[in-house]
């Protein structure tokens, strides 16, 4: 959620930043709604003060009867009625909060202006792409290996699901353990095993609700399946005041993730790129406003390390204003090279959300010896999605005979297996 005080004091800049997100100017409407709310709040405070004064006089009167006493009682009763009506008006005046809840985060000054991914800015590349490399797509390879099943899985769950078997299931498990080990041992992230069913308020805190309600799966009893472990991890500091010396807090978690893929009809309908259920290792950092820019680079580098150790070519893109996520003020996308598609595809998003999520979930910190609190900054990064990483390994490590060479760093995690070959039932 955006800071209403900042909007109040920076109307023109607010409208300019909204325009960068391709949203029409809204400062005038917000000013009107904010003015109405502040007027009601001011009246409530005045009546509360008047009630306090009159109640004190009543309490100090020697005689608890007579015209003066009864007149003061009538005044207090009238004030209570006014207060009840005003407080009801304030509770019913939800339009301002509803409007603020629909605004995305304000883009950082470094974010390039643009409508879509074509305007994203290249930051750096890693590794060499080979235009003459073998170029079967991952699903062709997986099906030929008899270790990736879409057809039978569709009978169980429908489209956009997959069943992995044998050594591909083992590769999935190896990747999870490898990624967690790297992030905990080399990058100082603390491992968490969080719930994957969360309440709506947790989704709201992370910026998933109300705007993206249709993109998640809701149960019939008030829970939602998480679209990313970011939801569970950032909420670990909801409604808390953290001592400054404990920051930064860095969490890593592996979870299954669930997305309805609303609006993705016709996109990536084959294979494992876009599934309703997928596994992902997620990184979350909680830090101070002064350190969040450096922490953004840190968490991005942690994600990159996985691809570097797997020797997979990739590039880092700075997303433009029109391509950023709702809660982000600045995002790097990491895109891995897929020979089967002959293009880079997103494998990780690394975002600095500033105090956007913290304001929603009331997550603050304070210096030692101080009573003043400040909103924390939250950051998140994929570290990485297991399925898409497996896609990249299959396509970049494929051999002429359809077998898959295991990357060196995974051989121990695979129990010494160096190559995945076709499974014969």
From Swiss-Prot:
Binding-site residues for ATP, renumbered to this chain: 259-261, 346-349
Main location: cytoplasm
Catalyzed reactions per annotation: tRNA(Ser) + L-serine + ATP = L-seryl-tRNA(Ser) + AMP + diphosphate + H(+); tRNA(Sec) + L-serine + ATP = L-seryl-tRNA(Sec) + AMP + diphosphate + H(+)
Pfam family, one: tRNA-synt_2b
GO biological process, one term: seryl-tRNA aminoacylation
UniProt keyword annotation of ATP-binding present: yes
Protein family membership: Belongs to the class-II aminoacyl-tRNA synthetase family. Type-1 seryl-tRNA synthetase subfamily.
Protein name: Serine--tRNA ligase
Gene that this sequence comes from: serS
């Amino acid at each position: 959620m955006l800071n209403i005080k900042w909007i109040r004091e920076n109307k023109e800049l607010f409208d300019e930043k909204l325009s960068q997100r391709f949203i029409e100017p809204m400062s005038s409407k917000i000013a009107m709604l904010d003015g109405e709310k502040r007027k009601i709040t001011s009246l409530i405070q005045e009546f509360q003060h008047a009630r306090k004064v009159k109640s004190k006089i009543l309490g100090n009167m020697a005689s608890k009867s007579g015209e003066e006493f009864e007149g003061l009682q009538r005044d207090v009763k009238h004030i209570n009625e006014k207060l009840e009506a005003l407080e009801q008006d304030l509770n019913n005046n939800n339009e301002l909060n509803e409007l603020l809840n629909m605004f995305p985060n304000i883009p950082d000054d470094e974010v390039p202006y643009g409508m879509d991914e074509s305007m994203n800015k290249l930051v750096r590349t890693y590794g060499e792409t080979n235009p003459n490399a073998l170029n079967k797509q991952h699903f062709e390879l997986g099906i030929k290996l008899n270790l990736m099943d879409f057809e039978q899985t569709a009978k169980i769950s429908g489209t956009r699901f997959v069943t992995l078997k044998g050594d591909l299931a083992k590769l999935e498990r190896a990747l999870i353990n490898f990624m967690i080990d790297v992030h905990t041992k080399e990058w100082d992230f603390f491992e968490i095993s969080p719930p994957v069913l969360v309440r709506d308020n947790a989704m709201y805190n992370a910026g998933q609700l109300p705007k993206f309600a249709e993109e998640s799966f809701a149960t019939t009893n008030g829970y939602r399946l998480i679209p990313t472990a970011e939801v569970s991890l950032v909420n670990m500091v909801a409604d808390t005041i953290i001592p400054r010396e404990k920051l930064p807090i860095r969490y890593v978690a592996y979870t299954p993730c669930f997305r309805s893929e609303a609006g993705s009809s016709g996109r990536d309908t084959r294979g494992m790129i876009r599934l309703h259920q997928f596994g992902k290792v997620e990184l979350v950092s909680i830090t101070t406003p002064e350190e969040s820019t450096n922490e953004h680079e840190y968490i991005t580098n942690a994600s990159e390390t996985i691809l570097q150790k797997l020797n997979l070519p990739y590039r880092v893109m700075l997303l433009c204003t029109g391509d950023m996520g709702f809660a982000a003020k600045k995002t790097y996308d990491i895109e891995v090279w897929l020979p089967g598609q002959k293009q880079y595809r997103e494998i990780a998003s690394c975002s600095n959300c500033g105090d956007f999520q913290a304001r929603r979930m009331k997550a603050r910190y304070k210096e030692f010896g101080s009573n003043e609190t400040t909103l924390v900054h939250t950051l998140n990064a994929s570290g990485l999605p297991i399925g898409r990483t497996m896609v990249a390994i299959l396509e970049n490590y494929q051999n002429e005979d359809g077998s898959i060479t295991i990357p060196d760093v995974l051989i121990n995690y695979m129990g010494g297996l160096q190559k995945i070959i076709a499974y014969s039932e």
